[in-house]
Structure formats: C-alpha cells, structure tokens
C-alpha cells in the first residue's frame, strides 16, 4: 500500500476526539525518531482535559544558523455526530468510489501523514540537508485550544526558538487539490452583552423597563455599522450576533435582562481595541444599562508574498498544474498562535467540503500529490 495512505488509515483508526490523542502522536514520534528527530512531549491542561502536544526537530548541517521549516497540525478531530447517519464506522477507514472515509480524513490526518512521509523521503534523499525541519502537533485544535499549540509556542518563545517557515496542514483546497492556500486569517473577537431592565407584569409596562426594547435600536446600529473597508488581503470586518437570550419563559412577564452574544471577524484594517471602543460608544449613546465581557480568540495574521508562498505555489504548480489562489477567508486556525514566533505561516491541505460533516472523506487521488507538494516545499527551502 502507498505509505501515505497507510499512515492516514492508521491515524483515522485512532478515536482522537478533542482532547484525546489516542496514540496518534506516539506513531509520529516513532517514525520521526527513526530518521533523526529529537522529540519532546508537552502535556498540559486540567486532569479532565489533558492535552498532548509534540514538538520534534531535526537540525540540518547549518545547525541553528540555518532556516527552520515547521509542519504544524492537529491529531484531534471533532465528534462524529449521529453514528447511524454514517455509511461506515467513522473510525474504520473505508474506501468507496475512490474516496477514503473516516473522521479526520480531510481535517487533518491525511495532511499529517503527508508531512511525515514527505520528510522521510526528503531525509533519505538529502541526508546532509542544510536547513532544519520541525513538527508542531497538538490534540487541542478543534476544542478550546487553551492548552494546545499556544502552549508549545509559549515554551518555544521562552527558550528563544526561531521558526522561519511554517506550513499548517489545514484543508484549504476547495474543488481540487491545490486550487487555494491560506496565507492569513481574520482575527476573532467575541462579546457577551447583558442589557439590564426591570422585570414586571407585561400588562403594566410602566412599572418596569423592557431591556429587549432598550437593546434593539443599539443592536440595529451595530448590525448596520461599517467597521472598515478591508484591504487587498482581507474582506471588510464583519459583526454578527449568534445568540439572544431573554425572558423567563412566561408570556406575561417583561424580562429583567437580555443577553446577546456577538462576534467580530476582523481584518488587519482594525484592531481589537478600536472595535471595542466603537461598540462601547454606540451602546453608551443609547444610554443602556449594560455589562460587556470580551474574549479575544485571536489576532489576524498575514504572510505576504515571499519565500514560503513562492515555494509552496511553485510546488503546487509542479504537482497539480494549478496557479494557486492565496486567500484569507474562513475561520480561525492555530496559525494565529504560530505567527507570534514565525514570520511566514501558510496553510495548505486537501479539499474541505466534507470537514466536520457526516461521511467526512478525502479523494484517494489527492493523497500522494499532497505529500509530493509538501516534499516540494522541503526541496525548495532547506535542501
């Protein structure tokens, strides 16, 4: 069997729902140690949410003076959803119609397998490679991400480790392998707004104050606000409400408060501080009695065209024929953490149409070319 496909299937068999790793990283560590990597496990998190992280590095002939290319990814997967809706066991890799089915097939165990086999081939072909190679793997990307990649980044930063390039194996392709890569991601800023009123009988509104009515004009203004125009790399910043909770459940009671959850997906044209200030200004203008708690999920990051993007684009062109599109669309990724210690971060992986869905899959015809692209990046940057 093709070694990349075989490793992908082995990883899919592991029921590694966040934060469980279920031995995936042990498989990777064994293979990486066999080709000269130094491997370090970093376990963190509370007892009921233990996260497994792996940092592995193989120095090139230039030592720490040479460039360091890191492959980053996650072994954890999202829950399966209703098992009865799957056409096969999500943790038993299954082939149908030229596709490999299983939870994590697209997001992102195929990419991790491609990383490993590409590096094995590269090291065999270039035993005296000049630059260094690293792996940063976590079991907490699909979850809260408090004890995953960010903890490894903090540890590496504390010891002065410098990363020059990072390829994250997120499933970035759309219709075919290589048609899109991500050279940045928007930031995420969430707010929990509680507007206070005075509870009373709905027939006597003059005896209370309806917080839903109070909040509505301000929410309408927030929804209509143009936060920025975006720029050549990012679309305009968006503000969206996700949840509104108010009332006691009774139809004859004006509630005492209403809570609204909202989220910004923001570009490099805005800052968290600036967005917060503008929200508070709008709320204050409406004279609301409110509290507002903020959570910064991640800053935006951007890798302009440079050595990594050119190497990846060239490798994709050579393998697939595509002139790949650089994009910053989609949700957040662990790139938001890695960008703190690495100036060039790009994501590339298989098509993403089935990720997080019932019957997640990857087309088998894309597996070997994916590995070849990763090897092509190694050849172009650190051989």
Curated annotation (Swiss-Prot):
Residues annotated as binding Zn(2+) 2: 107, 142, 356
- The UniProt annotation places Zn(2+) 1 binding at 74, 107, 170
* Enzyme Commission identifier(s): 3.5.1.18
Any GO molecular function: cobalt ion binding
Textual note on the cofactor? Binds 2 Zn(2+) or Co(2+) ions per subunit.
* Keywords per UniProt: Amino-acid biosynthesis, Cobalt, Diaminopimelate biosynthesis, Hydrolase, Lysine biosynthesis, Metal-binding, Zinc
Q: What's the catalysed reaction?
A: N-succinyl-(2S,6S)-2,6-diaminopimelate + H2O = (2S,6S)-2,6-diaminopimelate + succinate
Can you supply a Gene Ontology BP term from the record?
Answer: L-arginine biosynthetic process
Record-linked InterPro entries = Bact_exopeptidase_dim_dom (IPR036264), DapE_proteobac (IPR005941), Peptidase_M20 (IPR002933), Peptidase_M20_dimer (IPR011650), Peptidase_M20A (IPR050072)
Q: Which domain of life is it from?
A: Bacteria
Q: Name one Pfam family in it.
A: Peptidase_M20
Kindly identify the residues recorded as the active site.
76, 141 (proton acceptor)
Pathway involvement of the protein, from the record: Amino-acid biosynthesis; L-lysine biosynthesis via DAP pathway; LL-2,6-diaminopimelate from (S)-tetrahydrodipicolinate (succinylase route): step 3/3
Q: Which cofactor does it need?
A: Zn(2+); Co(2+)
The question of whether Amino-acid biosynthesis is a record keyword is answered with yes
Which PANTHER family does the protein's record reference?
Answer: ACETYLORNITHINE DEACETYLASE, N-ACETYL-L-CITRULLINE DEACETYLASE
Function statement: Catalyzes the hydrolysis of N-succinyl-L,L-diaminopimelic acid (SDAP), forming succinate and LL-2,6-diaminopimelate (DAP), an intermediate involved in the bacterial biosynthesis of lysine and meso-diaminopimelic acid, an essential component of bacterial cell walls.
Subunit and partners: Homodimer.
UniProt similarity note = Belongs to the peptidase M20A family. DapE subfamily.
Record's NCBIfam families? dapE_proteo, PRK13009.1
Q: What is this protein called?
A: Succinyl-diaminopimelate desuccinylase
Q: Which organism is it from?
A: Cupriavidus taiwanensis (strain DSM 17343 / BCRC 17206 / CCUG 44338 / CIP 107171 / LMG 19424 / R1) (Ralstonia taiwanensis (strain LMG 19424))
Gene giving rise to this polypeptide = dapE
């Amino acid at each position: 069997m093709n070694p990349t496909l075989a490793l992908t299937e082995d990883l899919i068999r592991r029921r590694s729902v966040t934060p469980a790793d279920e031995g995936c990283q042990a498989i990777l560590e064994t293979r990486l140690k066999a080709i000269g990597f130094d491997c370090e496990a970093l376990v963190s998190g509370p007892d009921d949410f233990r996260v497994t992280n792996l940092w592995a590095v193989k120095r090139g002939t230039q030592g720490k003076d040479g460039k360091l290319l890191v492959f980053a990814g996650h072994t954890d997967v999202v829950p399966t959803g209703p098992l009865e809706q799957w056409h096969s066991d999500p943790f038993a890799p299954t082939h149908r119609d030229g596709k490999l089915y299983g939870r994590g097939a697209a997001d992102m165990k195929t990419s991790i397998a491609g990383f490993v086999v590409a590096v094995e081939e590269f090291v065999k072909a270039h035993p005296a490679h000049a630059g260094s190679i690293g792996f940063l793997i976590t079991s907490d990307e699909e979850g809260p991400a408090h004890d995953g990649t960010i903890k490894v980044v903090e540890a590496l930063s504390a010891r002065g480790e410098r990363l020059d390039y990072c390829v994250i194996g997120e499933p970035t392709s759309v219709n075919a392998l290589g048609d899109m890569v991500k050279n940045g991601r928007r930031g995420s800023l969430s707010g929990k707004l509680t507007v206070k009123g005075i509870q009373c009988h709905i027939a006597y509104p003059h005896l209370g104050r309806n917080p839903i009515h109070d909040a509505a004009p301000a929410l309408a203004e927030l929804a209509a606000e143009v936060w920025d125009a975006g720029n050549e790399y990012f679309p305009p910043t968006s503000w969206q409400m996700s949840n509104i909770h108010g009332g006691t459940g009774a139809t004859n009671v004006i509630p005492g408060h209403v809570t609204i959850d909202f989220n910004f997906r923001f570009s490099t044209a805005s800052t968290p501080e600036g967005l917060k200030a503008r929200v508070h200004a709008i709320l204050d203008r409406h004279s609301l009695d409110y509290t507002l708690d903020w959570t910064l999920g991640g800053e935006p990051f951007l890798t302009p065209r440079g050595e990594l993007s050119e190497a990846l684009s060239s490798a994709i062109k050579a393998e697939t024929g595509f002139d790949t599109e650089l994009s910053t669309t989609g949700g957040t990724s662990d790139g938001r953490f890695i960008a703190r210690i690495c100036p060039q971060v790009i994501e590339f992986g298989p098509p993403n149409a089935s990720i997080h869905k019932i019957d997640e899959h990857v087309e088998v015809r894309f597996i070997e070319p994916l590995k070849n692209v990763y090897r092509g990046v190694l050849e172009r940057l650190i051989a």
